Regions:
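Short, aliphatic-rich beta-strand segments
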Residues: 22-28
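N-terminal amphipathic/basic leader segments beginning at the initiator methionine
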Residues: 1-19
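Structural motif
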Residues: 23, 57-58
Length: 125
């Protein structure tokens, strides 16, 4: 399973992972009842992708709200990216958010502090 697509629901984000382009997109709210069930396929996909060599991976985030378990899952994904970056794999994150939602901007900044790879935070008007 090289492509991954998970439709958005009222409590889960749209997730799309494209093997050919090396782009993983997550958009929307994330407060699922079972974040493990939602994010484990994503973590598995990222692990498989990063194990395939030195191909660039870009994570594009437009997350509006994350509950605690979703934050932990995103940390797991960023840890995989950090490990790959340490091995010379080109990885990047771009987190776009509504400028009126300061809480999400602050959360993105907190994540960025723990990352040594390129991590852009873009406030949209």
């Amino acid at each position: 399973m090289n492509q991954l697509e998970i439709p958005e629901t009222g409590s889960t984000p749209y997730i799309r992972a494209d093997w050919d382009t090396g782009v993983l997109i997550m958009k929307g709210d994330s407060y699922p009842e079972n974040s493990f069930a939602l994010f484990q396929p994503v973590v598995d996909w990222v692990s498989r992708f990063l194990d395939q060599g030195n191909r660039p991976l870009k994570l594009q985030l437009e997350l509006l709200y994350l509950n605690t378990s979703s934050i932990r899952a995103l940390m797991d994904i960023l840890d995989l990216l950090e490990e790959a970056h340490g091995k010379g794999v080109p990885v990047t994150v771009e987190w776009s958010y509504d400028a009126a939602n300061e809480r999400v901007g602050e959360l993105a900044e907190e994540f960025k502090e723990d990352c040594t790879f390129p991590f852009a935070i873009v406030a949209k008007p």
